[in-house]
Each structure stands twice: as structure tokens, then as C-alpha cells.
Amino acid sequence: MKYSDMIVPATQREKADPRQVENSAGGYVYEVDSAARLRRFLVLGTEGGTFYASQKDLTKENVSFLKEYAAKDPVAFYNVLDEADADNIAPRHSTLLLALAVLYTHTDKQEVRDTIKARFTSFVRTGTHLFEFVEYVTMFRKWGRGLRSLISSWYTTKKPSDLAYLLVKYRQRGGWTHRDLLRLAHGTKDATSEVRNVIDYAVHGIVTIEDASKTGKFTTVNDDVLPEVITQFEQAKAGTLSPVDATALSWEMLPTEALKDPLTWVALIQRGNLPYTAMLRNLGRMTSIGVFSDGPTLRAVVSLLTDESRVLRSRVHPFNVLTALKTYSGGHGFRGSLSWTPKQPIVDALDAAFYAAFGNVEPTGKRINIALDISGSMGARLMDSNVTAREGSVAMAMAMLAGDPLTTDTVAFTSGAGSWTVPSLRQRFAGYPSGITEIGLSPRRRLDDVVRETNLLRMGGTDCALPMLWAHSNKRVYDAFVILTDNETWAGSIQPMDMLRTYRADVNPEARLIVVGMTSTGFTIADPQDKGSLDVTGFDASAPAVISNFIAGRF
């Protein structure tokens, strides 16, 4: 069947929906309002329609819209930030911190600033967040009474033990230290005496009783004065406390030399001081120094990795587990010279954890068409990973099926054979349905079996419009098309965005398009003014959440 019977070229320049507006090119798109633009910025880190897996620097030059919105309607701006934080839609907290800094420095409404101060520790939860916020806010203003009071409140409103933990775990970033910030804020009069002791430690370090009598500084190492985490941190740093006995310290707080000792990691595993994702990141390091050379520790870590309740509590995405599996089984990292001989029980445990993590995928409630590019170049590896683009795309499809099993279809696509003519355009379009193969995908199938199946399919060029052409031809109704490719579309002669507009006009006006460039080549397809299209350039651990939130209409 030829598509010329179904495609109506004129629909690109006609309203498919009363809510559409005319763009600068004479076409009709859904207008992106200010709140939607802000939500998109919080998720993507840009005002356009592209999510970059390789994080780009956030600077004051790329937030002109944010400044205008903050000055015009600061209450609405704040409400978007509050909702986005509560819904956890920003994969990188940096974008929310930058937006918060813009709002704080560009509103003249004192009640908005007061609200920010009252909720400051909810947005700025860790020491790293605080350092980032200060870096951003000082791009727009100098230190004044209001900013000093705001930063001071981050320290003075916490419990002594909580503040001590944050000071020790997040000691510096981007050239800032807590000592710097406290000296600039110079306002801790609202702190309790216990909190003031912790603040004195951050500014002056440990001061002995003898030194205190000379300098007038009160802070001492006495357990009655400072929380245990500071005491143990200083003792471990000085070598007077074995890391094995430093029960109050997380692995990030321990001296670098201590992390070269297998017994340190054994103690962390036995105490449960190693969160699930931290364990995934450090499996190679632990193997390289012999942590798993004894049976009991190896069995313990296998048990932790395969504990389904721990997997679900960690909320780790299957793609992240797959990355850990491929990295560990590969026997080397991608930064530095670290290498190891993989332990097969750990490889098997990670394989089991991959499937267990499907339980962490939240449903979108949408009808989805997942299209897997099967061109030969999909064998390329994703950035900083042993995962190939083909493996990553299949894993992503399996995860999405786990979230919406009854409303998701999966197809493999390449450029189809043949062509058809649209007389009104005096053009011939390539891409018959022969380029589409439906795949019986399920989260219960083995990943390697599905990858093997897609490898056997006929390969050709890349035509990212073809999945929508196929759905249009077969009258399949979808809310979203997710196209997983590694290459710029080139084989077809109708643009994917044009095909999306045709599909919207004839089938579903609300249909969304996500084109995921698994290996970033810098190309983009989405119209940045079209709220229903998104490019994902490159693929990393944060990309699945971006895709899911976009399909669900959360930004």
C-alpha cells in the first residue's frame, strides 16, 4: 500500500487543533507557555527541545527567559519550582538550583524571598547543593544582608548531628568551602550553642583546650561538644582510629589510603554503610584490591545485590544496572587505569538485579510505540560505557514495557524499499512498510536473546519518520513515539517532524515524539517551539527519567 493515499501535505500549514498557533515558518504548533518553558528548562537544562547526556555548563548567558519570567511573575515561577522539586522531575538538581538563584536575585517581591528562605533547606539539601547555589547566585549579585542571612540559615536551622554529617561528607566544591561561606555569611547569632560548636569547627577546625585558652576559640574534640561523626572523621584522618572501627562514617568520608585496604570495604559491607548505587559503582575497585577473595564476603555482596527489596528501595533504573553489569564484566573502567578480573557470581548477581530493577519503572499510562533502529552502526558503544547502542536501546524498550506492558508496542526499523508519489508536492517519498518489523518484546525475555534477534534482521539506512508512517498506515493510535537510534535520519525523504504533524492531524493531535540519539553526534530533530517533541542527544543514567517524564506530560 502506498502512503500517498493517507498523507495530506497541506495539514502542515493548517491547524490540527484549535490550541495551535502559527510559528515563524508558517506552520502550526502547540505554543509553549512560560510555566511549560520553565519546566522544560528544569528537565533539559536548556530552553530548547534537546536533552544533552553530556552535561553542559549552566551560565548566566543562557537564562534570559528565566530572568524575564522571575521579574514578571515570581509567584508562578516559585510554584513551578516547588512542584518540580516535589515531583522530582529534574534529573540534574543543578538546573533547579540555577532557577532558584535567578528567582531570588530577580524578584522585587519580599514575600517571595521570604518563602525561598523558609523553604531553602528543602531545595538546597546537601553541601554540594549549597556550593552550587552560591556559585549561581553570585553570578547575578554581590553578597548583601539578604544573601548572608539566607546562607546562614542553611547552617543554623539544622540539628547539630545533621549539620556535622553534611559538613564532613560535602567538604568543598568549585573552589568553595564551608569556611568560605560561613565567613562571608558571618551571621550565626540564631544558632544554638551546639550548632555554633559545629560551625566553629567548620571555620577553625579542631582546637584543643590548651589552644582555646590562648585564642578564645571554644571548639574542642571532646565528644560532649562535637558530634561523633566529626570526632571519628578527625581521628581517622589522623590515623588514631582504624577505618574498620569508624562506624559513623560513610565511605566518602574515609581517607583515600583507607579505601585501598580490603578490610575497610568488608567493614562497610558488614555494617550496611554502603548504599546500593554506591556498591554498584565500587564493585570494580573492591574486586581489584581483593575484597572478594574470601567466600563469606563474596556471598554477602551477592546476597545484597540480588536482594529484591534493596533493589526496589534504591529506585535504581534497569539501564543503570546494565551499565554496571557491562562495566564490571568488562574488567576495566573508562577513566583511569583501574582493572580487575571479574567474579562470575557477581556478574550473575548483576544480571539478576537488572531484571529485578524493572520493578522500579513507573508507568506513564500512555500508549507508546518504541522503535529500535537496527542499522549496522548500532554496534557502537555508548559514552563511557561497555554498553552498545543496540543493547542500550533494547534494555530501554524492555524497561518501558515493564512500566506500560498493555499499551506499548515495539518495532524494529530501517529504511524501507520502494517509493510513492505525492502529486501535489511533485515529489517521490522513500520508505515502504517493509522497513518495519514488529518485535515480540517482553521484560521477561533475556536481553541477549532480543539483541541477537535484532542483529539477524535486515539492516539498511536510518529513516526516523518510518515508525510514524507505519502507524499512520495501520491506523495505530499512540500517545508517544520513542525512536532509539544512533544516527541522524537520512534515508527517508519526508522529515520526521512533518510526519509527526501529519499523524497528529489524522490520528492523535496529542501525539509526542522523542528521538533518542544513543551515541551523541550532535544532531537534533525536535522543533524547540513544539512542546510535543524532544531530542535526547547521547544516553546516560539520567536519560530514562527524562523520557518517562516527557511521555507522561510532566514537562
List each model region and its residues.
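Long lumenal/extracellular ectodomains of secretory and single-pass membrane proteins
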Residues: 1-388, 404-555
